[in-house]
Amino acid sequence: MNKKKSKRYKKLLDLVKNKNTESLEDAINKVKQNCTTKFDESIDISLSLNLKQKKEEITLRTVVKLPNGNGKKVKVAVLCEDTKINEAKESGADLYGSEILINDITSGKINFDKLVSTPSMMSKMGKLGKILGPKGLMPNPKLGTVTADIKKAVKDLKEGQVEIKNDKDGNLATSIGKKSFTDAKIIENFNAVIKTIHKEKPSGIKGDFILSSFITSTMGVSYKIKLKA
């Protein structure tokens, strides 16, 4: 941490006088007040779930459609048959192809954020698993990225569909907007994430599924949010 950042961060820490929970509205207001950098900082949340991982235990991995997106541009590639190239092009995909795209990925040319594949092309994805898997780019039916409906998949990804997944300690983090977003848009996105997570609660989990929730900005400090019952 450089001196300039360290001095700024210490000043921000001085503003956090206690560890009391905040209402979502108050927490957003304080996070925004602390956004003193010149760029449009991301507004991020981190959640602690009642889902610590052990071998062969279920992992929460799903997608949530943020009503207002998160302010980040997503570059989408579509792997499809030659007969569907025009459909992929018209869908708004940034990259599209069949064998040529496979060859590009094999050679390490991965200049996209999300990859959509038609079902029939998945049989050719085997050799790409070792390349795409570690990067979290492997198409997955559960996440809506293996589908015959190319137009819908690309539209969803472009309009704010994001993947959420917990780590081995039960923590989950995602971006829900930018400083420039109105409070109402951030709140709407936050509620969409919370609603989706509650729907994914495993039947064997007793008690609260979300143990704690924090909100912060790219260069700011975090505030604990009091979740509504």
Can you annotate each of these PLM segments?
Residues 27, 88, 133, 215:
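Residue-level signature of catalytic and energy-coupling elements of molecular machines
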Residues 1-19, 26, 86, 183, ...:
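Intrinsically disordered, compositionally biased charged tails
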Residues 39-43, 200-212:
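Flexible, glycine/charged-enriched surface loops at secondary-structure junctions
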Residues 68-106:
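Glycine-rich active-site/cofactor-binding loop and its immediate structural neighborhood
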Residues 47-49, 80, 119, 176-178, ...:
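Flexible glycine-/small-residue-rich
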Residues 94-197:
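Long, charge-patterned amphipathic alpha-helical coiled-coil/hairpin "stalk" segments used as oligomerization
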Residues 70-72, 82, 167-170, 206-209, ...:
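Short flexible coil/turn linkers enriched for glycine and charged/polar residues
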Residues 22-25, 29-84:
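Translation machinery proteins
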